[in-house]
């Protein structure tokens, strides 16, 4: 399983193509913001405005992540794993964790797609 935040959709589309060349059975899962969530770097594109690079067939499933869950996971990544990642990476990690809970024994990879230093002035990472 491969999990990625879906911003411009370039990463998830490109990685999907590459991984499926190697293993057509790989599952590609996108992290999308839940209704009302404002997660920098993740965007739920209206159908008429989807990026031209995006191939809907490249993604098997989209899982919604709430802003609070994404921010908390970004803090956990920093505190518990030493990975200073941003909020969209926190969202992807949260989705990966949900997939891991339901797919016992599966190999799951997610992309850390942004840095935490961009959010130091926002209060996401308290001192």
Where are these regions (language model features)?
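Beta-strand segments within the central parallel beta-sheet cores of soluble alpha/beta enzyme folds
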Residues: 1-3, 27-34, 106-113
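Active-site/ligand-binding loops adjacent to catalytic centers
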Residues: 20-87, 102, 123-127
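Short, surface-exposed, charged/polar-biased interaction segments
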Residues: 49, 83, 95-98, 117
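Phosphate-binding loop/pocket of nucleotide- and phosphate-handling active sites
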Residues: 97-127
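Short glycine/serine/threonine-rich phosphate/pyrophosphate-binding segments
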Residues: 5-15, 88-96, 119
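Generic structural signal for well-ordered alpha-helical scaffold segments
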Residues: 16, 75, 96-100
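Glycine-rich beta-alpha junction loops
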Residues: 7-10, 32-37, 46, 67, ...
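Glycine-rich ThDP/TPP pyrophosphate-binding loop and its adjacent helix/strand module
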Residues: 1-26, 101
């Amino acid at each position: 399983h491969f999990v990625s935040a879906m911003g411009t959709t370039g990463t998830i589309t490109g990685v999907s193509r590459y991984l499926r060349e190697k293993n057509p059975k790989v599952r590609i899962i996108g992290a999308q913001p839940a209704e009302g969530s404002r997660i920098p770097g993740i965007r739920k594109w209206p159908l008429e405005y989807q990026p031209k690079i995006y191939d809907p067939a490249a993604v098997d499933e989209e899982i919604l992540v709430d802003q609070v869950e994404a921010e908390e996971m970004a803090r956990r990544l920093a505190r518990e794993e030493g990975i200073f990642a941003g909020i969209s990476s926190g969202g992807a990690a949260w989705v990966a964790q949900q997939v891991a809970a339901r797919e016992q024994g599966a190999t799951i990879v997610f992309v850390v797609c942004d840095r935490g230093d961009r959010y130091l002035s926002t209060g996401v990472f308290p001192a």
